[in-house]
Amino acid sequence: MSETLLTLTGVQTRIGAYHILHGVDLTVTRGNLTMLLGRNGAGKTTTLRTIMGLWRASSGTVSFAGRDITALPTPQIARLGIAYVPETMAIFADLTVKENMLLAATHARHVGDMDEARLKWIFQLFPAVEKFWNYPAGKLSGGQKQMLAVARAIVEPRELLIIDEPSKGLAPSIINNMIDAFAELKARGVTILLVEQNINFAKRLGDDVAVMEDGRVVHRGSMAAFAADEVLQQSLMGLAI
């Protein structure tokens, strides 16, 4: 029987005078990759930021592994085993790739303090991280920066990985690398929640799908069923069929 890892129930979020989320109900199954889709302005990024405590829910609850995390501060949420990669990637451009990785490794002050086996595995997932180890992160390409951002998020073991638009602006070869990496993370038991605009990327990778519109989740189901129903895709996403 599938186990729910993350649950949002009736979540509403207001930012100043703006009421952005209007009662979001969402479940993420442990071990699955859930795609959160929707047009621009649907509330996807706000949902991720609300999960992470970066913006506070004005009502409703966010639960992780059976624990109410709605009011927890962001650092405490992260310590529960949740990593978040925003669309801006959150890397330090003036630091080297190595220094970026060290900053993400909470208990390591030197490379020698890092989990050697895990670091080797990350290098296998993202060869660019090893190749450009001593390069300033700001000189990397967009795809290489995205790889570094995800590598930083998994430098320590995580139960849940949340990423906002990982395929945005990436070349097809980098997208394929990302798909392989996410598949490997899933194989290692990491649960993943991705926001995406690239429907083809989403179809190739997702187990489950939730579609947002006007601050609400208006569709939930399997990605296989969603991918097979072009009329549903067109009605929810405005896609040409």
Role assignments for model-derived ranges:
Residues 6-8, 21:
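Conserved structural motif at the start of ABC-family nucleotide-binding domains
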Residues 16, 97-117, 125-127, 221, ...:
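ABC-type ATPase nucleotide-binding domains, specifically the catalytic core motifs of the NBD
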Residues 37-39:
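The feature captures the beta-strand-to-loop junction immediately N-terminal to the Walker
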Residues 52:
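Helix-to-loop junction immediately C-terminal to a conserved catalytic motif
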Residues 60-68, 80, 114-119:
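Conserved ABC transporter NBD signature motif
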